[in-house]
Amino acid sequence: MRLAFRLAAIIVGLSVCSTSIAGPVPSIIPQPVSITEKTGHFTLTETTSIITHGDSLAQPAAWLTSQLHLKQGGGGKQRILLEIISDKTLRAQGYFLQVTPSTIRIQSASPAGIFYGMQTLLQLLPADAPEGASAPAAPQGASAPAIPCVDITDYPRFGWRGLMLDVSRHFFTKQEVEQYIDQMARYKYNTLHLHLSDDQGWRIEIKSLPQLTQHGAWRVARTGRWGEYLPALAGEATTYGGFYTQDDMREIIRYAADRYITILPEIDIPAHSLALISSYPNLSCTQLPYSVNPGARPPVREDNALCIGNDSVFLVLDKIFTEIAALFPNPYIHIGGDEAYKGFWATCPKCQKRMADEHLGNVDELQSYFVKRMEKMLNAKGKKLIGWDEILEGGLAPEATVMSWRGMAGGVTAAKMGHHVVMTPWDYVYLDLYQGESAVEPPTYGLCKLKDSYTYEPVPDSVDEKLILGGQGNLWSESVPNFRHAEYMTWPRGLALAEVYWSPKAARNWDDFTKRMEVEFVRMDHAGIKYARSAYNVTLIPKRMQGGEITVGMSTEVNGLDIYYTFDQTNPDNTYAKYDGTPVKFPVGAGQINVVTYRDGKPIGEQVNVKKDDLIKRAEQGHHVY
């Protein structure tokens, strides 16, 4: 389902009181820089017109017209004005939004700023409206939605506000990627990083290398838990996968550009290259035939690394990046560079000869040689190189931008060297990690809770903020087999990160955010977007006591919830024992604790049931989940 809700549905479904008294502060994510409430409201009707000043606004005006089912350039008394202005007080991508009883005015120095102002405008509309009607706005006899009168000044803290979608481990269709783009646009994201290649699939057509999609895009079908799948059997049909033709990708790029989102392509090299090597076996050190990995544990680690001593590797990569550079307008191309096992390079005659010829002292310097050579290749095609923080190993390429994922240390190192950085530390922004109590979450690994994402600060005190381009959330898809689950893993952590990357640091307030998040959940319900309510669930915190006994603490991320529990294996409600903040002991003979959350006398979280033996294991390992 496409972006936002349809205004016609709001009109049919709501009856709005026409009071002139200023109401509560509007619920907007990400939080604007400045918002001033006024009295009164603007009433949206079918005669409301959208008027533009400047040819560059034709596309955003058409987009807003389609969202609100209004007329563009008409003569109604109620008007929405879109204006390009020159105002030195307004930062890049910023906008002014003014709502009066007769006029909505969105002003910016750029069409992108106008578009971001539109997203805020849509969030000023009532949230609790049915979805899907297609009648024009405010037909005769229908109640018209009221937009509160406000003055908003807004601009982003960072220029890079992204999400990464791994389409290699599991393939998502063009239509699903466009849905993801629509969802990103609601919250003013501007970069979609597509992880287009890995050991489990090659996802972009390269016309000069047809084997990449004829062979590398497909693998044997498996279901179960990632890493435990059976390897491909001899002669087994490869029926699972897919790829984007270049025409598909042009449509995605254009679709994203219409929403002021740029696509960052990633071709992961020199490691994570099994789909490439499986298609062209001469590119690895072993030159052995391999199957595209279906999600099984690899029999050896090093089979997925390109042979850096093989000149054919660079000829193939030049073909790939010639087509990638021509296809994607983004000035950056991501080359991966992560998790390269270097053992085969250490024993490969070709790699050893390369090291001798280039006077390289070790295999880290060999990887650095590779990255620097790739930077020259991309620069010659008019592109800039970006890679994961492992590209620091052995020496960083002169102009490379570092995407720091193993914590923030790599980003700090790169920034102190004067390089640009995109912060993406796994423990704050990896959207494939558990987001709550593992007993009620689909299986994955690690832990990144909603509050972790919201409280994350992308700029360490020790670096120049100007070198931090921004950041992104990363959705690796090993444990994300379908698009609905991709939505579930993205939201609401994606809401938290949208605010981290857009709003002023000082404006962040956890309790206020969770209230606004709940309003956004209503919008998501009507838009058909799946999201997680994990922040309302109990997290159990076990502790092993002397004598072998175990106590259990309980907490929730959202404040103000009541927790009820039982040890008798029944389903607790708000008549059961209430947790008072003091860790509780397991009674003699009890083998399980069941807990649930309530607010204002009504259940709000899922019931969580965890066995005592599992809690003991967690206590011994120092884990709260998994």
Region annotations inferred by a language model:
Residues A58-Q59, F171-T173, D199-E205, P270-L276, ...:
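Flexible loop/turn segments at secondary-structure boundaries
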Residues L276-N282, P294-A400, W405-T413, M417:
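Active-site neighborhood of glycoside hydrolase catalytic domains
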